[in-house]
Design a protein with these regions (language model features):
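Extracellular/lumenal and peripheral-membrane lipid-interaction modules
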Residues: 1-154
């Protein structure tokens, strides 16, 4: 299901409607080129390389799914939205928290999906008047992709 410009014209009907946006590993690769994302049912693996003295060693972070744990930040110069992934394996958390768009909060990895969402075809089809009114309501880690559910706020 996608958002169409005709649907957005009727703004009142979209306020309570959730739209699923599927974000693929290739979409994440455009924003985080030095990381590999693997999605399986309720499990997200992020693979990367950490710098050593003479060589690079690989790491694999594993995060779970906390479906309702999302964040939406709206400000004068800042705009961000993302998900909180429960940390299953803490390997690589330090390296990931140094990257832009990722941070740790307690036992969760805070992962920004705004950059990935902005590069999606669905986001490009949304009229500019509604782009600043989008919020993430929940997410699901599925086999092969991350489902982000967005809605329009007043």
């Amino acid at each position: 299901m996608g958002i169409f410009k005709e649907d957005l014209i009727n703004f009142g009907n979209l306020i309570d409607t959730e739209v699923e946006v599927r974000l693929l590993p290739e979409d994440f690769k455009r924003v985080y080129p030095d990381l590999d994302f693997e999605f399986s049912d309720r499990l997200l693996r992020i693979k990367g390389k950490r710098k050593g003295l003479l060589f690079k060693r690989g790491f694999e972070f594993r995060g779970g799914q906390d479906e309702k744990r999302v964040y939406n930040v709206r400000g004068f110069e800042t705009e961000d939205m993302g998900v909180y992934l429960p940390i299953i394996s803490s390997e690589g958390v330090e390296e990931l928290s140094r990257k832009e768009g990722m941070d740790t909060e307690g036992e969760h990895l805070k992962l920004s999906v705004f950059g990935v969402l902005k590069r999606s075809n669905i986001y490009r089809d949304i009229p500019d008047a509604f782009k600043d009114k989008l919020v993430i309501t929940r997410y699901k880690v599925r086999d092969g992709y991350l489902s982000v559910y967005i809605t329009v706020t007043k």
